[in-house]
Amino acid sequence: MIKLESLFDISERKRRKKLLGRGPSSGHGKTSGRGHKGDGSRSGYKRRFGYEGGGVPLYRRVPTRGFSHKRFDKCVEEITTGRLAELFQEGEAITLDALKAKKAIARQAVRVKVILKGDLEKTFVWQDTAVVLSQGVQNLLGIT
């Protein structure tokens, strides 16, 4: 049962709705609490998640987690026997530098793998350890 002394004054707990744009004496007149100019004064404006008023946001201040091996990965290119036949003359030495000079591989490449595709009727000198022959090319040349 509700007693009279247990009732509380509801008038103190009711908060009036903020009326905007109702004259200068209301405290929320003219710019309606939005300030002058800028994004926030425009209709439809919403702050981006994580926005901190133009300062560097937390998600950019905190260092990234984990480790990426991408910086240290070795660049390995591949080239076909048909492409080698186009680029090099009979008996020419195939080295990493020679392939880079002919722009057949990327400059940052540290190793090249020769893949059997196309004909290999010319003979070449394989003297660079960075140029690796695939199993198919080794079988074709009789190297085992």
Curated annotation (Swiss-Prot):
InterPro entries recorded: Ribosomal_uL15, Ribosomal_uL15/eL18_sf, Ribosomal_uL15_bac-type
Span list, region Disordered: 18-49
Source domain of life: Bacteria
Cellular component, GO annotation: cytosolic large ribosomal subunit
GO molecular function: rRNA binding; structural constituent of ribosome
Keywords, ordered alphabetically: Ribonucleoprotein, Ribosomal protein, RNA-binding, rRNA-binding
Any one biological process term the GO annotation gives: translation
NCBIfam families in alphabetical order: rplO_bact
UniProt function note: Binds to the 23S rRNA.
Assembly with partners or alone: Part of the 50S ribosomal subunit.
Family: Belongs to the universal ribosomal protein uL15 family.
Full protein name: Large ribosomal subunit protein uL15
